[in-house]
Swiss-Prot record:
Belongs to the RNA methyltransferase TrmD family. GO terms for biological process: tRNA N1-guanine methylation. This is tRNA (guanine-N(1)-)-methyltransferase. It comes from the Bacteria. Specifically methylates guanosine-37 in various tRNAs. S-adenosyl-L-methionine binds at residues 121, 141-146. One of its GO terms (cellular component) is cytosol. Its main location: cytoplasm. The gene is trmD. It comes from Psychrobacter cryohalolentis (strain ATCC BAA-1226 / DSM 17306 / VKM B-2378 / K5). It is an enzyme of class 2 (transferase).
Amino acid sequence: MYFAVISIFPEMFATIREFGITGRAVTQKQVTIECINPRDFTSDNYRRIDERPYGGGPGMVMMAEPLSQAIEDARLRASQHGCRVDKAHCPVIYMSPQGQTLSESSVVDMTEYDGMIILCGRYEGIDERLLSQYVDMEISLGDYVLTGGELPAMVLMDSVIRRLPDIMGDDKSAEQDSFVDGLLDCPHYTKPHEFAGMAVPEVLLSGHHANIAKWRFSQQVERTQARRPDLWQAFTPTVEQAKWLKALAKADKK
C-alpha cells in the first residue's frame, strides 16, 4: 500500500517509517511511505506556505497554491507506484477535528485502497478553496484540537497498516483487538503464574479452547457494558455469541 504525506515537518515521520510493525512493513516493502513538503513548491526566498486570513483574526492560514502543487505531485507519485488515482482507490484525506471520527470499521474499509494522500494542516487551518477542490474526505481522531495533522496522520497510517494482510505475523492478533467485533478486548495474561498475589485465571491454563473462548467473550461483554455502554447498545452478536449471551444470562440468574 502507498502513502503520501504532505507536511511541513516530514522529519516527524521517521518514527513510523523506521520503528515497530510499521517500520518492518516499510523495510519489507509491504508499504511505501513518502513525505512531500509543500515548502518545496513555493517561489519566494522565505518558502512561505502561510498568510494572514482575509477578514482579519488571529493566526495564519496555509495557502492553496503550494498545497495544490504538493497534492498533484503526490498523485503523480501514487500513479508511479501503481495506484489508481481517484477518490475510490487513492483519496486525498485531510486530518481535521471537523472530519468524520476514525473508527475500526472505517479503518478496515481503508485497507481496500491502493493508497492514500494525507494532508497535514498547521496554524489556523487551510484555505477553504483548496479543501473544496482537492480533498475527498476529512478525518478526525476525536473532539479535541492538536497543533498539527502529523500525529493524527501517523495514527491513521498505523491503524490501517496493522490491518493489512501479513503485516502482524499472526492475523488473529488484529482480529482479537478491541472494536473489531464491536466489543472491547478481553484481559490478557502471561508469565509468571502469580504476580502481586494475583493468579492467572485457571480457565486459561486448562487447555480447553472452547471454554477459553467463552470466558474471553464473557470478559469482553463485562468490560464493554461497564466501560463503553454506547458500544454495548450498538453491539450485534453472531449466532454463536447469542448462544453464549443466553448462557451468561442463565448463569447470572443462578
